């Protein structure tokens, strides 16, 4: 049987760039999604295209340590470090997690000027019935 010749331009032969390469944007939007189990931080440009992202799980925190404020702070600094030269940013925070304040502290400590901070946590207008309360 003849050996298969790889097609030039196929995905195996193309060098895929690393996720940690640096991007240059002047103004962006930082989306923060916090829960009690994890924190996800995504940096987008004005049009909404994701430039970089990070989470507490990708930073090496496993299990219950992903939900801590320190893990959220590390995730925010890793997501912002990839974007070089971003001067102004809008922050959208979603969710009830512990890491909300820690993410804001990390963003302000990185030198990015915050134009506004918006809480976009979805609130039901008496929608679905919530799950029953836990009895421990």
UniProtKB/Swiss-Prot annotation:
Keyword field contains Ribosomal protein: yes
Q: Name one GO molecular function term.
A: structural constituent of ribosome
Q: Which domain of life is it from?
A: Eukaryota
Tell me which InterPro entries the record gives.
Ribosomal_uS11, Ribosomal_uS11_CS, Ribosomal_uS11_sf
Keyword rRNA-binding tagged: yes
Q: Name one GO biological process term.
A: translation
Q: Where in the cell is it found?
A: Plastid
* Record keywords: Plastid, Ribonucleoprotein, Ribosomal protein, RNA-binding, rRNA-binding
**GO cellular component terms, semicolon-separated:** plastid; ribonucleoprotein complex; ribosome
The record's listing under Gene3D superfamilies reads: Ribosomal protein S11 (3.30.420.80)
UniProt family annotation: Belongs to the universal ribosomal protein uS11 family.
Quaternary state and interactors: Part of the 30S ribosomal subunit.
Name the record gives this protein: Small ribosomal subunit protein uS11c
Tell me the organism: Epifagus virginiana (Beechdrops)
